[in-house]
Amino acid sequence: MKKRLALLMALVMVFSLCCFSAPAAFADGKTVINVMSFTDEVPNMINRFVETHPDFADKYEINTTIIATTDGLYQPALDQALASGGADAPDLYCAEAAFILKYAQGDMAEYAAAYEDLGIDVAAEIEAAQIAPYSVEIGTRPSDGKVVGLGYQATGGAFIYRRSIAKDVFGSDDPAVVAEAIGAGTQSWDKFFEAAAALKEKGYAIVSGDGDIWHAIENSSDQGWIVDGKLNIDPKREAFLDLSKQLKDNGYHNDTQDWTEAWYADMAGIGDQPVFGFYGPAWLINYVMAGNSGGSAPGEGTYGDWAVCPSNVGFFWGGTWLLANKDTTKAEAVAEIIKWITLDATEDGLQYGWANGTWSGEQGTKDTVASGAVMAVSNGELDFLGGQNMFEAFVPANEYANGSNLTQYDETINNYWRDAVRQYTAGELSRDDAINAFKTNVADNLDVEVDF
């Protein structure tokens, strides 16, 4: 899910993690569990599990392969590893929102083990932990109705804004005031653009680039890219063409692209125009914005000058699901790991420590997690947000998270669409030509029926 780690993972690939090393490489007699991921997030969680479960550590060794999603490298490598099978195949693997359906419901779903076949009482565990319904929905295989994957985060989105700019333009940094200004809950962009005009008058950009509204649009659409085997352009996604052009033509953003240095610079307030806000889940704050704010304590850079309010459109963005190989010979051990990360709602589980910031390292930042039972007893106050409890905004936002608009081709098709939109807003293509170029890319590169 988190492209913030793309560069790091590209560097990691230089080392031996690029491919599976043979289980025989471990000479201590332990059983090897192969793990495959696209960032170090889940591997770090598993390492923590091993550290806190000495009996498990006495019997098992974790062999990790990390391949970044950069340049589309992860999925082909995972597909080959699953199809090839054998001792080097992953016992446990990860998939993010952009391609989870491929592995839980699509072309590669046959390789996933049902959680119940691993010995997990999945229905009872889900009920006890109050797991977010969309996480279960996305991880359920249609062919047999069985859960084959669960996430550990809840990724409902909100609007994250600069307090100082809110005071200057709207007279208050109160989340209720800003929510009203951007039209929170209206499922419309009308008030947002009224706010953009007011911000522009005082020299501010409302967002950094069109990508900042894309994720809200993409994940609030009613239908996905594929309907009944044919390419489908949901009206809300088609409207992105016009909304993006409106942003650019009026100078309402800095025309950056997400996951670039210019985008990060706007988080620190050092871009072309000071940027008012970003759309995203809690993980965007913890793992992207905080580290790019130009400081590490209130008063440094923009650190502490942020707050969160409900979004004008309900959406979610991201998430990672854990799946097990149906052919694993270590089902009991794999089940222990999966349960601790995705289903354990006790104070000893990953999710409680993560939600409350009691772990060290990356999982030491507070985050919204999939367990409603954990969220009910967790505190989301952050210095980065001026002491605001972010859970007050993010927990209600999770009601908008669902898997109904996801497809197994999202990562690829999203890239085609956003490229076409940028060509249109730059004046390189007409609106109709941009849509046709997008359709041509899909038709030429994917096994999807396209109407022109």
Segments (PLM) and residue ranges:
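Extracytoplasmic/periplasmic substrate-recognition and gating elements
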Residues: 31, 58-60, 64, 83-86, ...
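Hinge/lid segment of periplasmic solute-binding proteins
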Residues: 95-158, 300-309
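Mature extracytoplasmic/periplasmic domains
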Residues: 26, 110-112, 116-117, 286, ...
